[in-house]
Amino acid sequence: MKSIERYKNLGDDGKMDLLDDFSGNPSVEFLNYLEGELFSIDVDEFVKVEILKFLSRFRHDNRETKDKIVKLIVESYLDNEEMTLSIAAQELMFFDLGKDDFRQISDLLLDKEYQNMDMVDLTSSLIRLLCTKNRGGSSDEYFQELEKIDSYREDIKI
């Protein structure tokens, strides 16, 4: 609990420094608190980036954390800066993704409203994530759908 109180009392720069320089093992309560911060509209985008890096460093093997990061991307993309979401997609490289994750990411990329938003950096990060995590062809079916969209075709390397 000491880390949560200390964290809350810091300004944005202090929070980023604390997360970047953190040594030791953070408490479960602190990690859970940080996960909640990802969905707050009051948290600065640069702080969210440090939270994402922190979580991928200390919780890369936690399914619930991975699910929350995927949720941040696919359900909260309208409420967050593209930079934050692109970093979230990049940090997912450190987590194990399953078929459901591939489906959610693919569905977002196929969504017409999302495509009209022209989020180039996020789209590139998501396609790179799918390509990198495509071990054993587990996401080939999603690539077939995505290849039908002209703007995605060149980015997809099967």
Give, region by region, the residue ranges found by the protein language model.
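Amphipathic alpha-helical scaffolding segments comprising HEAT/armadillo-like alpha-solenoid repeats
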Residues: M1-R6, N25-F39, H60-S76, G98-D111, ...
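Generic L/I/V-rich hydrophobic alpha-helical segments across diverse proteins
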Residues: L31, S124-L126, F143, I149, ...
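Structural detector for internal amphipathic alpha-helices that build alpha-solenoid repeat scaffolds
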Residues: D13-N25, F46-R63, M83-L97, M117-R135, ...
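Charge-rich, low-complexity amphipathic helices
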Residues: M1, L52, S56, I73, ...
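Short coil turns that connect the paired helices of HEAT/ARM alpha-solenoid repeats
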Residues: E5-D13, F39-D44, E75-M83, D111-D118, ...
